[in-house]
Regions:
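Core catalytic lobe of class I
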Residues: 1-149
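S-adenosyl-L-methionine
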Residues: 151-171
Length: 171
């Protein structure tokens, strides 16, 4: 189970309980052998206590931006922005998921040229991200408007392969 901090608060007017700003992602596998590409989803984190061994950084690197290490991700994801109106990936779909969220799932659980299936495609985010990451994809959606949005986004993905928050293979 992965918890995604959606930043899209639900129950804004709730007076009898906590507002929900989390979404659950259930990650399931079948059998003992499955794909999990840990190195593909490591995160770049700022080092608070930079240890050295023989004068050299122990498990971190220094750059002009500071001291960072690549770390294994946890099952709580709070580094993902919901698509805002000004972001190129944004559509008017009420539950659109961010490309970065889907990218983490696809990179962790598939390899290049693998097939990714989304039986409830909505605005097509899964197919768009699969295409940008070199995967094959099948999107299924019954709403004609959402299908049109998805088709446009897939065409746009030919021109723009960037995923907000994912740069040079690092989140």
């Amino acid at each position: 189970r992965v918890l995604f901090r959606s930043q899209r608060e639900k129950g804004r007017g709730a007076k009898t309980n906590w507002k929900n700003s989390m979404e659950d992602i259930f990650y399931a596998t079948v059998g003992d052998t499955y794909t999990f590409n840990l190195d593909a989803v490591k995160q770049r984190k700022k080092v608070l206590a930079p240890y050295r061994e023989n004068g050299q950084p122990k498990d971190w690197q220094e750059s002009k931006d500071g001291k960072f290490r690549l770390t294994c991700p946890s099952n709580f994801w709070d580094d993902i922005a919901v698509p805002y109106w000004s972001m190129p990936e944004n559509t008017a779909h009420p539950t659109q998921k961010p490309e970065k969220l889907i990218a983490k799932l696809i990179l962790a659980s598939s390899n290049a040229n693998d097939l990714v299936l989304d039986p409830f495609a909505g605005s097509g985010t899964t197919g768009v991200v699969a295409k940008k990451l070199g995967r094959q994809y099948i999107n299924i959606e019954q709403n004609p408007l959402y299908c049109a949005w998805g088709e446009k986004r897939l065409k746009d993905a030919n021109k723009n392969k960037t995923i907000q928050g994912y740069e040079k293979g690092v989140f």
